[in-house]
């Protein structure tokens, strides 16, 4: 039997709510159809935003939403997306399917979406093909409340008060689709552009996010920080966060693998690659420690998730994929890693929110379904804003094939402001249940809530015909002990226990 020892007396780092953030790009059916259907649609909506989608996202307690990209961000010109919709310029979405982008969803619509969801804003600016002036004027348009050309233009377009821009990304993937830059060149451009991302209101500052590495490109991290911090140590390289992007491709980049047709070996390969996130955080974090030992700069994992071969019969540029119990495990594993490293990881964004990659929601016409990933993130929402607790897992062992060994169990534990402890655990075994003895430092805790996402079939997923095949359910396979609880975790499972005195 595995043993999980929890020391609730040792509170570690705060798990920022933004770790549970999301990403929505002008890609496929994420924005259009998935979120925004327009005011004249027969699908129920408020100011063009699907009511069913917004309600589901509010249940999820989405803390922050990144927009408009992604690769789309570095070819997006924000002024084309304001003013009367019939007068907005159209453009080609060159990265994603070559479709026509009519710009009917722009700055005002994004801010309205965030208002309806109740989340913070994360706007990604165009450094790759845009000018310093364009970026500066966008920030002025959104955040300045006095008299200025851009503030006046915002008012003319119907929004008197400025918005709060919580985070601003100065470019995206500038090592690739955002300009194919070298780290030194990008860092110098970052220093220049961010100068004009003005904080007009120090009482509600906009935090600036610098473009970080793709996967294991430690050379990029070192080069960017070395240049950004040059003669700027006291300003932490002019940044509040440094991004990291990592996707799980079971079979590789060219042929990624099916979302629903896989065997046990590919199951373990996928989970092993999900676990690689911890190595990336530790190694990039070690480089960040050289320049920022006090951890003033947050690691921002603002693109993560599974990326499979798109569903047969769909546009390859739309990145539409199904979502199984395997994805639920990937989500649970990854979120536990983020929690464990919340001293450095301050924000993350699952890619993407609706109809693209590892979505939490899928839509088809007026229908909407919640994916297994949605249900995991719904359980894990209790970690938001809580304090990570010291926890040690022993005796669990490993499972998998010779090439793709994974730990049988992963976990993280937190305590909220009311003293309620949240334990989230994953059983990575595709066939065997696992018993876990949970011990706490103090007695008197009782289970006040227990939930599970699982299915005996590792391929199980939700469809529009069967939307509740994999869902969140009450969990009863536990027994309270004198100073803890014994749990029997089914195979392929993600569980949450809530403990209180």
Pin down the residues of each PLM region.
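Non-catalytic accessory regions flanking glycosidase/transglycosidase catalytic cores in CAZymes
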Residues: 1-241, 277-310, 314-501
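Histidine-centered active-site/metal-ligand motif
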Residues: 245
């Amino acid at each position: 039997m595995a043993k999980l020892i929890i020391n609730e007396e040792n509170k570690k780092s705060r798990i920022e709510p933004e770790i549970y953030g999301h990403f929505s790009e002008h890609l496929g059916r994420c924005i259009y159809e998935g979120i925004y259907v327009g005011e004249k649609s027969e699908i129920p909506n408020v100011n063009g935003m699907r009511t069913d989608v917004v309600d589901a996202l509010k249940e999820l307690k989405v803390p922050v939403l990144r927009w408009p990209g992604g690769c789309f961000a570095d070819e997006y010109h924000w002024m084309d997306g304001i003013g009367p919709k019939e007068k907005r310029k159209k453009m080609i979405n060159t990265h994603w399917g070559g479709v026509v982008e009519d710009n009917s969803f722009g700055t005002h619509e994004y801010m309205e979406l965030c208002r309806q969801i109740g989340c913070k804003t994360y706007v990604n600016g165009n450094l790759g093909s845009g000018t310093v002036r364009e970026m500066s004027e966008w920030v002025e348009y959104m955040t300045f409340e006095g008299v200025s050309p851009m503030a006046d233009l915002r008012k003319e377009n119907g929004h008197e008060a400025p918005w709060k821009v919580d985070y601003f990304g100065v470019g995206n993937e500038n090592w690739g689709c955002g300009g194919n830059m070298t780290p030194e060149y990008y860092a110098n451009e970052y220093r220049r552009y961010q100068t004009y991302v003005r904080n007009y209101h120090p009482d509600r500052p906009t935090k600036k996010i610098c473009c970080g590495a793709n996967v294991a490109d430690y050379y990029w991290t070192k080069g960017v920080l070395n240049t950004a911090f040059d003669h700027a140590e006291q300003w932490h390289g002019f940044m509040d966060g440094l991004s990291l992007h990592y996707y799980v491709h079971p079979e590789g980049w060219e042929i990624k693998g099916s979302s629903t047709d896989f065997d046990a070996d590919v199951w373990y390969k996928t989970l092993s690659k999900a676990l690689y996130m911890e190595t990336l955080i530790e190694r990039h974090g070690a480089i960040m420690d050289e320049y920022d030992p006090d951890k003033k700069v947050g690691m921002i994992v603002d693109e993560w998730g599974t990326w499979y071969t798109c569903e047969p019969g769909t546009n390859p540029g739309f990145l539409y994929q199904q979502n199984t119990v395997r994805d639920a495990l990937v989500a649970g594993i990854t979120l536990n890693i983020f929690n464990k490293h919340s001293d450095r990881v301050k924000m993350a964004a699952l890619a993407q929110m609706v109809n693209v990659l590892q979505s939490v929601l899928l839509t088809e016409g007026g229908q909407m379904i919640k994916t297994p990933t949605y249900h995991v993130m719904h359980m894990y929402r209790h970690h938001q804003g809580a304090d990570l607790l010291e926890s040690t897992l022993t005796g669990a062992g490993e499972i998998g094939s010779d090439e793709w060994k994974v730990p049988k169990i992963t976990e993280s534990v937190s305590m909220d402001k009311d003293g309620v402890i949240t334990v989230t655990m994953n059983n990575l075994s595709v066939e065997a249940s696992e018993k876990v003895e949970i011990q706490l430092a103090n007695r008197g805790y009782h289970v006040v809530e227990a939930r599970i996402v699982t299915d005996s079939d590792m391929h199980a997923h939700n469809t529009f015909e069967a939307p509740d095949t994999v869902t969140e359910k009450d969990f009863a396979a536990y027994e309270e002990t004198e100073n803890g609880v014994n749990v029997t975790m089914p195979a392929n499972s993600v569980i949450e226990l809530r403990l209180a005195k």
